[in-house]
Amino acid sequence: SGVFHRFPKLKYIITESGCAWVPETLQRLDMAWKRISSGAVGEFQFAEGVTTPEPPSFYAKQNCYYGASSASPPELKDRDVIGTERILWGSDYPHYEGTYPDTRLALRHTFNTCGEDDTRAMLGLNAAKLYDFDLEALKPISDKCGPTWDELSVPLAPDEFPKDTHTNAFRTLD
């Protein structure tokens, strides 16, 4: 429908769906866009000008954000393709499958290899920018409650994985 072309400042936030699906979905949408734009769609007929000037992936990188609730390392492996600045971490609290009460362990497991800048972005700075949060006002709370990079950069030892958890955050297989 071209809504992002007509409204380039519109922001669309998809939550509770993770982000692992994004690269393949955008690749398929771009392929369909290219086929429709070139007329190579077999027996289907599309009106002239039905496609947007740019492929769907262009608008996704410009307008879309992904709420990665209870993200695991496999969930974030393609973060550079998606755009780290487009990913918003969420604990999924108070849902049964959320990270609580093992949130700090989940954060260490998921983000220890992401690097400090990417981790800070996904854990809060992206949301702060998107929603125009006052970071100075939030700093005392963050300093008191938030985990440090020194804490998050330490991988979990095998004996630290929670035994009775319902979150996907500790998933290690693709």
Q: What does each of the following model-derived ranges do?
A:
Residues 58, 89-90:
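Short leucine-rich amphipathic alpha-helices used at interfaces
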Residues 2, 10, 20-21, 45-46, ...:
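Mid-to-C-terminal alpha-helical segments outside catalytic/metal-binding sites
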Residues 2-57, 61:
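Aromatic-lined glycan-binding groove of carbohydrate-active enzymes
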